[in-house]
C-alpha cells in the first residue's frame, strides 16, 4: 500500500526536474537491475504480476492533481517537475502541471534524439502544448472545420480555409512531436492511439493535395475523421469510447453465432425461394403461335417480350408489378395473364433469394425487422402461404433471439463497466483513508489536539443551534432516491447478514448505541424527534453522531410541540463515524437502499396527526421527513457532478439542486424554515456550520492547511455572492411584512391549495387538449379565456409563494424554478400572441403537465430515469452525435453527387427524392432513419445511384455501430436505471405529499360523517350490539381500497390481542416469530385492537432487517386508533388493511371432498330459506346431490372433456369466414355444434354452481371468465331462437364468442403461469402506459398546435396526382375546380393527421413504431397553413419535431415497457424461487455444481464387437477425429450449396451435380460404416437416425428429384438441416465456450418461450376471429389485398403474425378507416348477403392499438425479458469453475473405464482414469499420493463408486468448505434414489486406509524377514520356544496397528449397518491376508 501513497502535500512535493533528477532516475534504474534476482521457475510469475507496483490511478496523465497537494507553488506552473507517482521512480519521466492543475506526463529522453528535457525549444513547446488556450484553439478549429465540411457546394474561397486548417493541424502535431518525442519511448507522440488519427488525417491531406489519386472525393471523406479528434480533446469521451470498444469485443461470439444462424437460414431461403420473386403476371401474346409456325422461327424476340415492363400486370398505385406463384396457395394472376419468370427481382432487383449473398441480405433485413412485411408479402405471394412457417422461425429465433442477445451482451458489458467504476471508487476510498492515516502520523501532536478541541466545539454548537432553532429535519428522501443497478441488490443481501451479525455483537457487548435497554430511552425513541417542517429547504451539515442516542439531546425536549410530525427510524441507524458504515456498500453513501426498503413495509404510519397551531404549516409538500445523518463521503457511483467556480468537480446527491448557493458539504440534511417567532439563520452562520462540519466529518484527521484547501474546493461561488443573497434575496425588512408573510405562508402552504393547483393543472391540460380543427369562434373564445384564467392562477401562486418564502428560498426548490420558468413563458406568450411564428411558445404551456410529477410518483420516476439516463449518458450522447455527424458527412461526400447525377434511376420525374444525401441536412436525416432501424429502402436508392459495394459498407457500418451497439448501450443504461425499488416504492420512502394529505383529510371527513350518521341511526333504531363494529369495518374496507396491491403485512382489527410470555404479540403467529418488530418502527402495532398477519411468501423479506426486540404496548390505544385512521399508503407500501373476515384459509387435505357453502353468511342471515339442514329430508338429498356433482367436477376426465369441448368450439369459430354462406352443409353443422357447445358449457356451469357453491365459484377470477363467456353464448342462443339474430347489438355480442379460447388459459399450466406473471405486471404496465400517455399528450397537443388543419390537399382521384400550388393554392381554389368536375377532384385530408388530440395520439403511435410514419412526416414537412395546398418540403425543419419525439417519445417510453417487465420478472422470481438469495457465493457455487452432477449418471457404452474387422471399424468410427472430419465435410457441402445461383450456366450445374454426388457417396459411406460397426445400436442414437433419413432422401433425390420437388419439398433442404450437427462439435472446441453459453441461454429459454408462444398464439387466434367478424368485407387497398386480408381464418393469422412485430399495421388500418366517399356502403359481395366495403374506424383503431400493445409491447417484451434473464444466468453458469460439459466429459471418459456401467471402477485403474480426464477435473500423473490423500471410500473388490470420485474431484476444484457436507448429503440421497444400484455396496475401506495398510504390511514383512535371518544362530529348541513366544506377541502387534491406528469407518459407511459386524469382518479378512503373506514368505 505504501507504494501507492502520495507524497506528503505542500511545497516539498513540487520539485523541479533538473539534470540531477535525471541522474537520480538513471541511478535508480541501475540499482533495480542489480537487485533483480534471476528468474527461477515460471511458477511464481503470477505472484510477481500481483506484487508489481502499478501506476496510481489518481496521478494518471490527463487527470487533475488531487486536492491534497494544495496549490502549485509560485513559478512551478508549466515547469517540468519530478514525477509524483512512486511507480515512475525507475522510469525516465517527468510531469508538468498547467493552471488548472491538470497533469501531463512526458518522457525524459531526448525528443527526436536532439531535444533534451532542458532544451529551450522543447520547454516552449511543452508550455504551448499544456496551455488551456491551445486546446481551446484546436477545439474551435475542429468545430469550424466540421461546419465547413457540411457544405455540399463549398464556395471558391473555402479552399484557402482548408489550407489554414491543415496548417493549424500540422502546427499542433509539430508542437506535440517536439514536446513529447516521436515514437521511441513511452508518452511520445505515436504512443497515443489518438495521435495516430491526427497523423493519418494530416498525411492524407498532404497526399491528396500533392498527388493526383483520381477519386478525390472518396479521399476527402477521410477529413471527416477529424471530427473524431473532438473525442481526444474532450476528457470524458475517451472512457466512453473505451467502453464501446469493450462491448464490441464482447460481441464477437454473438456476431459469429448471428452470422452462422443467418447463413443457415439464408441457405434454407436459397433452396426454398430461389428465382421465385421473379414470377410475374405476363400478358400472353396473341400472335405468339402463328408467327412461330409460318417460317419455323419466332416472329418476335421472346426474351425482349417477357422483359418488357409494359407486358406485366401492375396494380394501380403500386410501383412494382404484381408477383404470383404456381402453387395453389400462392398469388394468382387475373384472367388473360400467365404466371412466369420474367424481368428483374423487386426493389431494383435487390430483394431476392437467387444467390447466397442476396439471400443473406434478405435474412439480415428480416433479423433487423426493417420493412420485412414487404419481403414477407412478396415471398408468400410467390411461393405460397405455407411458407409463413419459415418466417415464424426466422423472426422468433433470428430476430427476437439474436438481436436481443446483442442487447444482453451490451447490457452486460455496461454492467461490468459500472462494476469496475464501483471497485475503483472503493479502492480510491481505501487509498484516501490510508493517505489520511499517513498524514495524521506526520502531524504534530499539538495540532491534533487543537483539531480535537475544535471538533468538540463544533459538535456542541451544532447541537445547540439545532435545539434552539428546531431545525434539522433531514434532507428529503426524494433527493436521495437513486436508480440503482442490480449489483446494489446483491450487495444488499450481503449487508443484511452483516447487519444482523453487528447487531448480535452489539447486544453481547452491551453497546448503548446499538441496543437500548432502559425503558425510559425506549419511550424517548418511540416518540422520536419531531420537527416543524415546511417546504423552504436549505442545506445544512450536522455531526455524524446519533443525536437520538445522546441522553438529554435537545431534540427530545421538543416532542410535545404542537407542530410536531411523527417520524421514526430504526435504532441501528445512527452510528458513530468509527463504526463500520453499513451504507458504504451502497451506490451512494446514504441510507437509501437498506433503510428505505426497511421502512417501506410500514409506510402508512408516517402519515401522522398533521394539524398544528400553525395549521398553515401542516401542508409542507414533503412532510414527515425521517431524520437521516450520514457517514462520511463514500464512493458515489451515479452521482451527478457539478463544476464550481474553481473548476473543481464535486459530487452531489442525485436530486440535489445544483443552483443552491450554500457550500456543498458531504453530510447534508435539509433544514425546514421555522414557525413564527423563530430566528432566521443567517447565511454566514450556515456557511460556518458547513465549514465546521466538513472539518469534523470528512477531514477530522487532516491538517489545518488541508481544511482550507478543501473549503475552497467545496465552495460553489465566491463569498460576495453569499453576501448579495443574504442582503437582497431574503426579505426581512419590517415586522408587518413578516406578519403578512406568515399569513400568506399559511394559505399557500396548505395541502388544499396544492390540491386546487393540481386540479387547475389537470383542467388546464384538458383545455389545451380540447383544441381541434375546425373550431367554432365561440369555442375558441372559451379556450382563450380559460387560458387567461389559468395563467392568472399560476402567476398568482408564484407571486404568493415568492412573498411567503423569499426569492432565495423559493428558488432553492427545483419545482419552483420550473414553475417560475413556465409562468414567465406564459406571460411572454400573452404579450407576443400576435407575433407571427411565435405561436410555438404556446407549446411551452404544456410543460405544466409535468407539475403533476410532484404528486405522481411514477411520472416523477420516469422523468428521473430519463434525466438520469441523459445525464449519465451525456458523453455517450456526444459520441452518438459525433457518429451521426461523421456518417452524415461521409454520405454527403461519397454519394451526394451521385444522387444528383443519377436521380432519374430512382425518380421518374428526375427530381431528388425526399431521402437523399445531396446536402448535409438530408444526409443527417438518412443516418437518423438508419438509427431508427430503417435502412433497407434508403440503401436500395443509394445502391441504384452510387453502386452497391460502397453503399453496403457505409449502411452496414451505420447499422451495426449506431443501431446495434450505441443504441443498445442506451437501452442497457435505461434498463440499469430501473430497479425493483423504483416501481414498487416510487414515492421515495413512501412519504406523503400534499395531495395525499388533502385526500386523507377529505376521507377522514367523509368517514367521520359516516360514523356520526351511523351513531345517529343506532340511537334511533336500537340495533343489536353485534352491529356496532360494522362502521369501522366498512371504513377499513374503504381504506384497503386506497392501498396499493402489494402483498406484505396485513393489519386487521381483532378484539383479543394477547401477549405471550416474551411480550411478543401472539397475533404475529409462529411462522414469523423471528420477525418481531422494533418498537420505534412499529409503535402503532401496540394498539390492543391490532394484530399483524404476515403472509409467509414475503417478496424479499424486509423483516430480516429489523431487530428482534419485544413489542411493547405502552402507547395509548386511543392515539393509535386515530393514527391508524389517517393511515394511507404509497404505491410502495406492502401493507394491506383488511377486515378481520379475510383470515388465511387453512389448507385442507386433498381427501377432504365436501363442497363449500352455497351462499355467504350474510345471505343466510338475511334469507332464512337459504339455510338447509343437511342431516335429514330434502336437505340430505340436496347434500348428496352436491357431493355427487363435486365428485364429477373434480374428476380428471371431466376436466379433459371440457378442455376438448373448448378446443372444438374454438375451432368451430375459425370456419365462420366470408365463404360460410356458400357452404351450406358446414354452416348447418356449425349452427347445431354451437347449440351443443352452449348446452354443454351451461351444464358445466350448473354442475360447478351446485358443487362449489356460489361463494367459491364467484370468488374465482377464472370462473368469472367462464361465466361471462357462457352468458354471451346463452344470450345469442336465445336471440337466435326468438329471431332477433340480425339485431346490431346481438351481432356485436356474437363477436364476443371469439373470447371462448380464453377459457383454455386456466386449463393449461404453462399459459396460466405466463398470464399470472402478466397479471402481476399489469399495475406497473398500466402505470407506465399512463405515464407514456401523459408524455405523449404533450407531443400530441404540440402536434395539434403545429399541424391542425394543415394536412388537407387537393387531389385528382382519376390520375392520382396532387395539384401544384401554382394551380391550386388553397381550399377555395380547389372548391372552384370541384364545381367544374365534381367526381374527379376532391379536397382530401390525410387519414392519419393531427386535427385533434385523439388523432394525434394515433399518428404518434405510428411514428413511435416507425410504421406509416413517413406519410405523416411528409404531410408535416409539406404543410403550410390551415386549408392551404401543401408545398413539397416547404416546411422542411418540421422533421425536427419528429426527431425529438422519436428520441423522447419512442426511445425512452417504449423501452420503459421492457424495463418494467424485466423488473417485474425479477420481483416475482424473488417472491417464488428466491431461495438462493440467502446463499453465500461459496454455497451457490457448490449448489450449482452439485445440481449439475446430480442429474447425470454413467451410461452403458456400446460394446465393442468381437469380430476383428468390425472391431477395427468400430475403433475408427468412434474416434473424435472421425466426427470432426465428417463435420468438415458437412461444412464443405454447405459451401458448395452456397455457390448455387438461380441463373447459373448448364456447365456450372453439372459440376455442382457431380460435387454433390461425391458428398452423397461420402455420407453414404459414413452411414454404412457406422451401421457395420455399431450393429443394431446404430439406431439407438437420434443423430444417426437423422443422418440415415437424410442419406436415403439424398440417394432417392438424385434419381427422383423432379417428382419429389413437384410434390414435396426439395431434398436439398434436408442437407441444410444437417448443419445442426455442427452443434455437436462445439463441445470439442475450447474456443467456442462463448457460443456454447449463448446456445445454452437459448436452451434455457425454450420452455418459457414456448409458453409465451402459446399465449401469443391464443391472442392471435382470438384477434383473428374478431377480425374476421368485423373486417372481412373492407375495401382492398393499402395493406389489404386478395391474399392479406381478414376474409378467412388463415389470412387473418398471416396478417396478425405480421403485425406482432408491429410491421405494416398502418397499411392494414388504413382501409378500415375508410368512410364514404372513399368507399361504398352499397357494394354487393357475391355469395354473401353483406353490403358495403367500408370499415369501422373506432373498432379498427381499438383492434389494432390493443393488439399492438398486447403483442408488440407486452408479449414480445416478455420474450426479451426472458432472454436477457437467461443470458445472465447462462453467463454466470459458464463462469462457474465446473460446467455441465465438464461433468459430461467425466462420464464419457468413465464409460471407457467402466464398459458395463456398473458405476464402479477398480482401484488400480484410478490413476489412469484421473489422468485421462480433461481440465479442470484432471489430476495429472504422477497422481498416486494426491489420490490417496483424497481418502476415497472403497467397496469389496477394491472398487470405487463414480459419485465418490466425482465428489472428491469437484472438491479439489472448488476448494474445501464446511458448508459442503449438507449439500453432499442431499446429492448422495438424490443419486441413490435415481440409481438404486449404489445401495447394495457399502464401503469397507478407503484409499488412504488401504495405503496405511500396505505400508504396515511392508513394515511387518521387513521385521519378519529380520526375525527369520536371526533365527539360524540359535538352538532349534530355544528357537522354537522363542518363536512360540514371539508369535503371540507378534499377533498382538500385528492386530493393533490395523485397528487402533486407523480412524473409524463412520464417515464412509451408511448409518443403517452394524459397525461392529463390519469391523469384525475387516479384521478377519486382514488376518487372513497376513497369514497368506506369512505362508508365502515361509
Swiss-Prot record:
Polar residues bias: start-end ranges: 1936-1947
Binding site for Na(+) 1: 934, 937
Compositional bias per record (Basic and acidic residues), positions renumbered to this chain: 28-61, 501-530, 586-597, 1949-1978
GO molecular function, one term: sodium ion binding
GO cellular component, one term: glutamatergic synapse
Note on domains (UniProt): The sequence contains 4 internal repeats, each with 5 hydrophobic segments (S1, S2, S3, S5, S6) and one positively charged segment (S4). Segments S4 are probably the voltage-sensors and are characterized by a series of positively charged amino acids at every third position.
Name of this chain's protein: Sodium channel protein type 8 subunit alpha
Organism: Rattus norvegicus (Rat)
Name of the coding gene: Scn8a
Amino acid at each position: 500500500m505504501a507504494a501507492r501513497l502520495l507524497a506528503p502535500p505542500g511545497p516539498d512535493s513540487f520539485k523541479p526536474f533538473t539534470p540531477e533528477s535525471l541522474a537520480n532516475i538513471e541511478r535508480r534504474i541501475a540499482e533495480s537491475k542489480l537487485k533483480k534476482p534471476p528468474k527461477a521457475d515460471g511458477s511464481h510469475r503470477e505472484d510477481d504480476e500481483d506484487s508489481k507496483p502499478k501506476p496510481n490511478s489518481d496521478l494518471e496523465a490527463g487527470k487533475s492533481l488531487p486536492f491534497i497537494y494544495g496549490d502549485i507553488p509560485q513559478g512551478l506552473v508549466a515547469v517540468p517537475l519530478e514525477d509524483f507517482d512512486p511507480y515512475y521512480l525507475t522510469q525516465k519521466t517527468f510531469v508538468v502541471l498547467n493552471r488548472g492543475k491538470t497533469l501531463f506526463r512526458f518522457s525524459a529522453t531526448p525528443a527526436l534524439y536532439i531535444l533534451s528535457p532542458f532544451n529551450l525549444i522543447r520547454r516552449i513547446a511543452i508550455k504551448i502544448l499544456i496551455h488551456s488556450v491551445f486546446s481551446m484553439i484546436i477545439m474551435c478549429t475542429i468545430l469550424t472545420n466540421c461546419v465547413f465540411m457540411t457544405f455540399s457546394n463549398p464556395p471558391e474561397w473555402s479552399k484557402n480555409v482548408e489550407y489554414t486548417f491543415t496548417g493549424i493541424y500540422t502546427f499542433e502535431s509539430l508542437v506535440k512531436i517536439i514536446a513529447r518525442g516521436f515514437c521511441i519511448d513511452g508518452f511520445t507522440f505515436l504512443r497515443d492511439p489518438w495521435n495516430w488519427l491526427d497523423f493519418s488525417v494530416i498525411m492524407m491531406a498532404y497526399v491528396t493535395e500533392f498527388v493526383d489519386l483520381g477519386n478525390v472525393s472518396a479521399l476527402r471523406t477521410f477529413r471527416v475523421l477529424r471530427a473524431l479528434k473532438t473525442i481526444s480533446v474532450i476528457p470524458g469521451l475517451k472512457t466512453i469510447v473505451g467502453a464501446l470498444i469493450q462491448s464490441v469485443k464482447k460481441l464477437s461470439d454473438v456476431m459469429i453465432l448471428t452470422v452462422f444462424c443467418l447463413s443457415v437460414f439464408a441457405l434454407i431461403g436459397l433452396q426454398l425461394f430461389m428465382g421465385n420473386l421473379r414470377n410475374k403476371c405476363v400478358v400472353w401474346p396473341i400472335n405468339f403461335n402463328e408467327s412461330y409456325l409460318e417460317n419455323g422461327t419466332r416472329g418476335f424476340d421472346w426474351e425482349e417480350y417477357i422483359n418488357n415492363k409494359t407486358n406485366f400486370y401492375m396494380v394501380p398505385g403500386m410501383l412494382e408489378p404484381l408477383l404470383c406463384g404456381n402453387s395453389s396457395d400462392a398469388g394468382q394472376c387475373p384472367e388473360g395473364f400467365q404466371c412466369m419468370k420474367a424481368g428483374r427481382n423487386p426493389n431494383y432487383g435487390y430483394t431476392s433469394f437467387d444467390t447466397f449473398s442476396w439471400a443473406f441480405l434478405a435474412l439480415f433485413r428480416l433479423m433487423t425487422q426493417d420493412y420485412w412485411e414487404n419481403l414477407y408479402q412478396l415471398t408468400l405471394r410467390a411461393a405460397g402461404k405455407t411458407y409463413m412457417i419459415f418466417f415464424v422461425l426466422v423472426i422468433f429465433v433470428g430476430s427476437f433471439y439474436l438481436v436481443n442477445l446483442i442487447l444482453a451482451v451490451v447490457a452486460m458489458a455496461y454492467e461490468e463497466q459500472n462494476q469496475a467504476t464501483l471497485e475503483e471508487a472503493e479502492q480510491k476510498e481505501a487509498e484516501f483513508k490510508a493517505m489520511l492515516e499517513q498524514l495524521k502520523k506526520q502531524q504534530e501532536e499539538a495540532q491534533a489536539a487543537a483539531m480535537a478541541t475544535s471538533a468538540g466545539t463544533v459538535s456542541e454548537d451544532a447541537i445547540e443551534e439545532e435545539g434552539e432553532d428546531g431545525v434539522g429535519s433531514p434532507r428529503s428522501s426524494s433527493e436521495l432516491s437513486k436508480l440503482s443497478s442490480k449489483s446494489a441488490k446483491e450487495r444488499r443481501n450481503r449487508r443484511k447478514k452483516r447487519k444482523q451479525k453487528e447487531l448480535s455483537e452489539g447486544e453481547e457487548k452491551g453497546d448503548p448505541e446499538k441496543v437500548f435497554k432502559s425503558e425510559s430511552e425506549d419511550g424517548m425513541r418511540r416518540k422520536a424527534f419531531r420537527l416543524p417542517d415546511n417546504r423552504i429547504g436549505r442545506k445544512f451539515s450536522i455531526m455524524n453522531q446519533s443525536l437520538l442516542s445522546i441522553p438529554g439531546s435537545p431534540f427530545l425536549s421538543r416532542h410535545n410541540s404542537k407542530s410536531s410530525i411523527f417520524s421514526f427510524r430504526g435504532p441501528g441507524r445512527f452510528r458513530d463515524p468509527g463504526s463500520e458504515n453499513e451504507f458504504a456498500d451502497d451506490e451512494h453513501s446514504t441510507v437509501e437502499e437498506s433503510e428505505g426498503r426497511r421502512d417501506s413495509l410500514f409506510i402508512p404510519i408516517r402519515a401522522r396527526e398533521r394539524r398544528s397551531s400553525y395549521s398553515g404549516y401542516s401542508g409542507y409538500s414533503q412532510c414527515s421527513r425521517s431524520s437521516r445523518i450520514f457517514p462520511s463521503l463514500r464512493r458515489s457511483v451515479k452521482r451527478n457532478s457539478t463544476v464550481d467556480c474553481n473548476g473543481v468537480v464535486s459530487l452531489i446527491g442525485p436530486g440535489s439542486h445544483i443552483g443552491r448557493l450554500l457550500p456543498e458539504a458531504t453530510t447534508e440534511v435539509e433544514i425546514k424554515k421555522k414557525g413564527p417567532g423563530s430566528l432566521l439563520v443567517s447565511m454566514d452562520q450556515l456557511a460556518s456550520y458547513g465549514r465546521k462540519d466538513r472539518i469534523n466529518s470528512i477531514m477530522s484527521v487532516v491538517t489545518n492547511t488541508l481544511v482550507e484547501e478543501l473549503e475552497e474546493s467545496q465552495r460553489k461561488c465566491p463569498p460576495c455572492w453569499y453576501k448579495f443573497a443574504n442582503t437582497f434575496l431574503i426579505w426581512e425588512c419590517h415586522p408587518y411584512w413578516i406578519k403578512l408573510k406568515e399569513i400568506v405562508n399559511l394559505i399557500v402552504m396548505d395541502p388544499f391549495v396544492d390540491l386546487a393547483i393540481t386540479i387547475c393543472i389537470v383542467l388546464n391540460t384538458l383545455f389545451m387538449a380540447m383544441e381541434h380543427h375546425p373550431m367554432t369562434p365561440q369555442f375558441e373564445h372559451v379556450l382563450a379565456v380559460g387560458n387567461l384564467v389559468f395563467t392568472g392562477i399560476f402567476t398568482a401562486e408564484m407571486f404568493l409563494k415568492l412573498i411567503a418564502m423569499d426569492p432565495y428560498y423559493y428558488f432553492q426548490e427545483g419545482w419552483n424554478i420550473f414553475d417560475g420558468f413556465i409562468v414567465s413563458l406564459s406571460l411572454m406568450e400573452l404579450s407576443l400572441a400576435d407575433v407571427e411564428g411565435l405561436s410555438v411558445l404556446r407549446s411551452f404551456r404544456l410543460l405544466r403537465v409535468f407539475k403533476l410529477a410532484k404528486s405522481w410518483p411514477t411520472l416523477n420516476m420516469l422523468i428521473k430515469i430519463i434525466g438520469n439516463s441523459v445525464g449519465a449518458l451525456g458523453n455517450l450522447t456526444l459520441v452518438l452525435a459525433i457518429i451521426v455527424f461523421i456518417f452524415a458527412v461521409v454520405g454527403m461526400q461519397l454519394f451526394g453527387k451521385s444522387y444528383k447525377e443519377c436521380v432519374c434511376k430512382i425518380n421518374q420525374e428526375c427530381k431528388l427524392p425526399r431521402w437523399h444525401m445531396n446536402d448535409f441536412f438530408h444526409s443527417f436525416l438518412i443516418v437518423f432513419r438508419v438509427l431508427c432501424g430503417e435502412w433497407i429502402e434508403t440503401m436500395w436508392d443509394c445502391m441504384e445511384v452510387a453502386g452497391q459495394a460502397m453503399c453496403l459498407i457505409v449502411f452496414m457500418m451505420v447499422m451495426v455501430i449506431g443501431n446495434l451497439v450505441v443504441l443498445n448501450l442506451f437501452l442497457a443504461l435505461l434498463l440499469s436505471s430501473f430497479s425493483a425499488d423504483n416501481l414498487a416504492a416510487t414515492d421515495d420512502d413512501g412519504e406523503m405529499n400534499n395531495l395525499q394529505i388533502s385526500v386523507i383529510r377529505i376521507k377522514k371527513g367523509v368517514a367521520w360523517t359516516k360514523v356520526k350518521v351511523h351513531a345517529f341511526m343506532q340511537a334511533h333504531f336500537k340495533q343489536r350490539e353485534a352491529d356496532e363494529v360494522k362502521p369501522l369495518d366498512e371504513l377499513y374496507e374503504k381504506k384497503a381500497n386506497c392501498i396499493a396491491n402489494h402483498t406484505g403485512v396485513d393489519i386487521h382489527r381483532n378484539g383479543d390481542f394477547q401477549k405471550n410470555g416474551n411480550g411478543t404479540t401472539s397475533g404475529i403467529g409462529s411462522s414469523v416469530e423471528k420477525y418481531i418488530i422494533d418498537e420505534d418502527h412499529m409503535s402503532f402495532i401496540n394498539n390492543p385492537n391490532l394484530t399483524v398477519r404476515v403472509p409467509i411468501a414475503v417478496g424479499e423479506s424486509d423483516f430480516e432487517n429489523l431487530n428482534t426486540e419485544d413489542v411493547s404496548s405502552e402507547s395509548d390505544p386511543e392515539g393509535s386508533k386515530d393514527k391508524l385512521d389517517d393511515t394511507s399508503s404509497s404505491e410502495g407500501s406492502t401493507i394491506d388493511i383488511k377486515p378481520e373476515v379475510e383470515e388465511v384459509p387453512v389448507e385442507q387435505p386433498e381427501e377432504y371432498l365436501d363442497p363449500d357453502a352455497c351462499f355467504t353468511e350474510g345471505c343466510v342471515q338475511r334469507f332464512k330459506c337459504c339455510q338447509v339442514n343437511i342431516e335429514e329430508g330434502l336437505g340430505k338429498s340436496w347434500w348428496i346431490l352436491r357431493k355427487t356433482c363435486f365428485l364429477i367436477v373434480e374428476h380428471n376426465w371431466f376436466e379433459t372433456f371440457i378442455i376438448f369441448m373448448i378446443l372444438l368450439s374454438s375451432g368451430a369459430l375459425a370456419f365462420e369466414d366470408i365463404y360460410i354462406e356458400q357452404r351450406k352443409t358446414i354452416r348447418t353443422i356449425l349452427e347445431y355444434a354451437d347449440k351443443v357447445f352452449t348446452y354443454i358449457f351451461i351444464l358445466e356451469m350448473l354442475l360447478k354452481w351446485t358443487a362449489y357453491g356460489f361463494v367459491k365459484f364467484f370468488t374465482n377470477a377464472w370462473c368469472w371468465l367462464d361465466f361471462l363467456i357462457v352468458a354471451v353464448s346463452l344470450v345469442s342462443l336465445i336471440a337466435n331462437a326468438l329471431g332477433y339474430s340480425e339485431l346490431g347489438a346481438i351481432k356485436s355480442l356474437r363477436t364476443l364468442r371469439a373470447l371462448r379460447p380464453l377459457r383454455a388459459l386456466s386449463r393449461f399450466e404453462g399459459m396460466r403461469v405466463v398470464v399470472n406473471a402478466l397479471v402481476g405486471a399489469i399495475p406497473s404496465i398500466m402505470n407506465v402506459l399512463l405515464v407514456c400517455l401523459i408524455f405523449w399528450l404533450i407531443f400530441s397537443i404540440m402536434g395539434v398546435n403545429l399541424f391542425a388543419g394543415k394536412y388537407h390537399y387537393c387531389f385528382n382521384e382519376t390520375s392520382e396526382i396532387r395539384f401544384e400550388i401554382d394551380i391550386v393554392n388553397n381550399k377555395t381554389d380547389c372548391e372552384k375546380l370541384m364545381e367544374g368536375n365534381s367526381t374527379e377532384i376532391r379536397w382530401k385530408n390525410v387519414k392519419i393527421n393531427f386535427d385533434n388530440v385523439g388523432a394525434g395520439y394515433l399518428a404518434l403511435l405510428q411514428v413511435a413504431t416507425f410504421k406509416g410514419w413517413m406519410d405523416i412526416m411528409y404531410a408535416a414537412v409539406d404543410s403550410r397553413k390551415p386549408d392551404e395546398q401543401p408545398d413539397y418540403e416547404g416546411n422542411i425543419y418540421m422533421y425536427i419535431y419528429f426527431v425529438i419525439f422519436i428520441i423522447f417519445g419512442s426511445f425512452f417510453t417504449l423501452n420503459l415497457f421492457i424495463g418494467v417487465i424485466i423488473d417485474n420478472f425479477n420481483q416475482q422470481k424473488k417472491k417464488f424461487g428466491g431461495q438462493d438469495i440467502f446463499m453465500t457465493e461459496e454455497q451457490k457455487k457448490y449448489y450449482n455444481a452439485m445440481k449439475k452432477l446430480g442429474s447425470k449418471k454413467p451410461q452403458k457404452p456400446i460394446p465393442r464387437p468381437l469380430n476383428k474387422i468390425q472391431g477395427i471399424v468400430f475403433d475408427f468410427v468412434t474416434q473424435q477425429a472421425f466426427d470432426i472430419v465428417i463435420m468438415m465435410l458437412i461444412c464443405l457441402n454447405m459451401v458448395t450449396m452456397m455457390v448455387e445461383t438461380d441463373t447459373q450456366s448448364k456447365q456450372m450445374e453439372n459440376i455442382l451435380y457431380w460435387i454433390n454426388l461425391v458428398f452423397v457417396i461420402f455420407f453414404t459411406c459414413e452411414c454404412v460404416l457406422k451401421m457395420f460397426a455399431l450393429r443394431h445400436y446404430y439406431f439407438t442414437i437420434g443423430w444417426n437416425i437423422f443422418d440415415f433419413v437424410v442419406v436415403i432422401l439424398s440417394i432417392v433425390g438424385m434419381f427422383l428429384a423432379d417428382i419429389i420437388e413437384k410434390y414435396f419439398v426439395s431434398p436439398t433442404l434436408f442437407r441444410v438441416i444437417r448443419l445442426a450437427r455442427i452443434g455437436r462439435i462445439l463441445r470439442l472446441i475450447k474456443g467456442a465456450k462463448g457460443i456454447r453459453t449463448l446456445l445454452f441461454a437459448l436452451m434455457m429459454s425454450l420452455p418459457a418461450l414456448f409458453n409465451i408462444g402459446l399465449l401469443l398464439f391464443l391472442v392471435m387466434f382470438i384477434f383473428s376471429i374478431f377480425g374476421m367478424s368485423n373486417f372481412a368485407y373492407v375495401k382492398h387497398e393499402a395493406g389489404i389485398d386478395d391474399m392479406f386480408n381478414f376474409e378467412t381464418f388463415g389470412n387473418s393469422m398471416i396478417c396478425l403474425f405480421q403485425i406482432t412485430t408491429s410491421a405494416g399495421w398502418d397499411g392494414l388500418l388504413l382501409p378500415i378507416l375508410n368512410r364514404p366517399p372513399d368507399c361504398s356502403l352499397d357494394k354487393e359481395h357475391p355469395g354473401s348477403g353483406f353490403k358495403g366495403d367500408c370499415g369501422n374506424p373506432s373498432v379498427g383503431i381499438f383492434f389494432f392499438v390493443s393488439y399492438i400493445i398486447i403483442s408488440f409491447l407486452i408479449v414480445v417484451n416478455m420474450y426479451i425479458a426472458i432472454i436477457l434473464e437467461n443470458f445472465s444466468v447462462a453467463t454466470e453458469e459458464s463462469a462457474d469453475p465446473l460446467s455441465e460439459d465438464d461433468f459430461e466429459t467425466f462420464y464419457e471418459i468413465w464409460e471407457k473405464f467402466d464398459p458395463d456401467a456398473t458405476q464402479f471402477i477398480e482401484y488400480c485403474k484410478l490413476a489412469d482414469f484421473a489422468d485421462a480426464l480433461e481440465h479442470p477435473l484432471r489430476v495429472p500423473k504422477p497422481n498416486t499420493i494426491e489420490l490417496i490423500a483424497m481418502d476415497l471410500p472403497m467397496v469389496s473388490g477394491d472398487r470405487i463408486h463414480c459419485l465418490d470420485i466425482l465428489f472428491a474431484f469437484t472438491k479439489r476444484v472448488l476448494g474445501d468448505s464446511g458448508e459442503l457436507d449438507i449439500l453432499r448429503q442431499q446429492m448422495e440421497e438424490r443419486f441413490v434414489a435415481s440409481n438404486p444400484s449404489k445401495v447394495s455396496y457399502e464401503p469397507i475401506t478407503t484409499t488412504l486406509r488401504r495405503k496405511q495398510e500396505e505400508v504396515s504390511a511392508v513394515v511387518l514383512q521387513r521385521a519378519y524377514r529380520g526375525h527369520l535371518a536371526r533365527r539360524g544362530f540359535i538352538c532349534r529348541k530355544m528357537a522354537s520356544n522363542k518363536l512360540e513366544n514371539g508369535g503371540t506377541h507378534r499377533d498382538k502387534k500385528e492386530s493393533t496397528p490395523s485397528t487402533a491406528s486407523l480412524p473409524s469407518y463412520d464417515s464412509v459407511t451408511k448409518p443403517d449397518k452394524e459397525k461392529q459386524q463390519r469391523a469384525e469382518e475387516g479384521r478377519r479378512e486382514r488376518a487372513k491376508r497376513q497369514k497368506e503373506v506369512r505362508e508365502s514368505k515361509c
